[in-house]
Amino acid sequence: MNKSENNVAVVTGIGILSPIGNDCAEVLSSLRTLRDGIAEATKIDVSCFASHINAEVKNVDFSSRMTTEELKTFTDPYLRLAICSARDAIRNSGADVSGNDVAMVVATCNAGMNSQEAEYKSMFSDIEFSREISLQGEFYAIARTLASTLNIGGGCFVINTACSGSTAAIAISQMLINQGKYKTVLVGGADAMSIANYAGFSALKVVSSQKTAPFSTPIGMNIGEGTAFWVVENFSQAKARNANILGKVIGHATTGDAHHPTQPDPRGDGAYRTMRNALLHSGVSLDDIACINAHASGTSANDKAEAKAIAKFSQDKYIPFTSTKSYTGHCMGATGIIEATCQLLSMNDNFIPPTLHFQGVRDGCEVTPVAFSGIEKEYDCFLSANYAFAGNNAAIVIAKERFEKFETKACDTSSIAITGIGMISSLGIGTAQTVDALHSGKVGVDDVTRFECSNKAGCVKLPPLRTLNRRIDFSGMNNISVFATVAASQALDNAGIRMRRDMSEMVGLIGSVSRGSSEEAHMLGVFNDSLRRGDIGCFSNVTANSTAGWVSKALEIKGANITFTSGLNSGIQTLEYAQMLLRGNEAKYLVAFAADELYAQQMKSYSDFGYLRSDATENDFKMKYYSVYKTVFGEGSCAFMLERTDNAKERNANIFGEVLASVSTMDGGDFYNANLDSDGLCRAFEIAIMQAGISASDVDVISWSPRGTAQDSKIINLRDSLMAKVPLVTSVFHTGYAETMSSLQSLGCLLYSLKNDNGLWTQRFGIDFFDNVECKEQPKIVASLASSHTGGNYVSIIKVAD
């Protein structure tokens, strides 16, 4: 055993609202009495589909856990579920889970789909759709919601890897505790029932009209909903306050299939590697794994692949495995933590619940799950795994408090190097082309020609796709996936990394998006058709992680794999997670990308909400303080290649800069306000310079991604108060404001320009005081600063390469 008690991640509180119960006791009773929560649908009208059943959360009194004002503000059911479950977890823990020293890691698949549906329902009925409803529908809404209702101001990671998201969230909570970044983390997931989601899976013909029977018959899944949250603390803090320790998170892994946008690798390779890596990370032996909680969606392709993976993972040993989806249905982004909760409660009651409705092994499934009445057994350790659309896989290893045969890997403070940069924007395809365009004063904002839109934007002009990179198969990709794949491949090439099959597991992928690809075709199919016929091709790309799935497949990247949807300007957060993975030795190389795509319905809604400039300032995009929202949007992708600096030097790589520190914080406040307060940004900056071992006066230049509105004043004020006359550098006023990737692109352009001795390009701020500030001849330290009205603040400190 090699562990530091301070940094062991322990579970001290659980809150759950699920189809089989709304607290731990009720859930355990359902597991014990073999009572599933699958029944006739009551929350949505499914009469036009082949299946009329689902698994719903029932009998929740939101008013007992939420104030009158909160009930008025948060109307989307998934946000209400999240608030109540999180509060239950905090109450169950007894910990003080508030303030700036607490982090959040939250996952969702569909986010506020019920709110998103209103946008399309309003086209065909009198349903109201407003900015307030739209904000609740965004992937990142859950972060601001919990920050404002729970008063949490630490770092916040919003994960969207579809059905594996909350398992990956638990993995990150372990990293944050193990690496000493936080002593308390609130982790969870939430998704609510929605007609658009039900229609999508029905169109794929994977929804069963009978109760799901994983690894057996009938074939098919049942759609579920729900939420679960855990309070995770470091061991010493929990013991010091005499907390009831419910379990330990001792291992984790994420991987990518690199196989198909929706279907799993039929060999079960990705699932096997994920379980294997989680076991290796925990340091326990296969003999210590007493049970596997399988993903077991009930679909033909998933169950066959997972059965192969379990057989390979188990080797010649018998490891009981079960599926709690047979109780709860498939609860989308919350399914991982709901299933882990079910298994943790069962382990603490010395019980392995059975896979319900089992009628014998299905053809093609090589192993038999625990069935019928379950197993009465005292055990100390289990593995829980989930596998999702886009080949996103995640697994965790959970143990009882008394279990000691594990290792908490030591985390070092190694420097992390940026060794490759790739990008695609309205200025061109490639970093060199974009930077050259910046230095020549070119502006990429123009009339929109790809779709109907009366406003201007910085749209990418794609040539025939085969001319972009003849090694890549772009077949089936949407625009955002093309953008990200091009940028990621350029970053690899720029770093001198030529992907080979034998190194695919050494390379990880971190994505950041604010939304998925255009959902118009699917949503219009659902709400402009009485039969609710969704669009199969579009539906598979609506999930935010589909972009990373396409990149993974195109470039054969099979290592650690995650997608963040933390909010506007959050592309720079990928550097924070990259630093955690590399310092934890969970990857050798990492591609970190951010991507955005503009589409017609998005621009129409933004116009309705007053987000678009429509006067003379649209034609000459510069800073204007007359609004907190109005901007000129752009699109594209930027990707960085990262590795440990010692590894980069060993292979004589070209180093653009070293990540000294990367920090995020969260602002709560009024959910609908513009977040003009600078407290969270200032806190992030202070923490970052402390971690980097520098002072504010050491910063030579600031990279930022302004929206071009009053919101940007907090970064200007921070500069003026601590770093007077330091240049502010951005590509935004040349390219248009891309919601997620502009923060990463501005930094990438700056580092590339400095590396090639091109200095700074002339800024288009529109105020001489900012446009013509002189910079040191050779800047040494760059501060990348980002913030937005969605509550997130992101700061990275970069040492410029010599």
Predicted regions and their residues:
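Condensing-enzyme catalytic core mediating Claisen C-C bond formation in acyl metabolism
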Residues: 7-14, 32-42, 50-52, 207, ...
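Structural signature of cysteine-dependent C-C bond-forming condensing enzymes
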Residues: 2-6, 92-107, 119-131, 144-156, ...
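Active-site pocket-shaping loop/turn-to-helix segments
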Residues: 6, 19-20, 66-87, 130-138, ...
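Short acidic, glycine/serine/threonine-rich loops at helix termini
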Residues: 21-22, 115-119, 170, 195-200, ...
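Internal metal/ion-chelating core segments
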Residues: 159-232, 238, 565-635, 642
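Acidic, glycine-rich active-site loops and adjacent beta-strand->loop/helix elements
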Residues: 15-17, 108-111, 162-165, 189-194, ...
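Conserved small-residue
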Residues: 11-13, 31, 86, 104, ...
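Conserved beta-ketoacyl condensing-enzyme motif
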Residues: 10-11, 35-160, 190-198, 286-304, ...
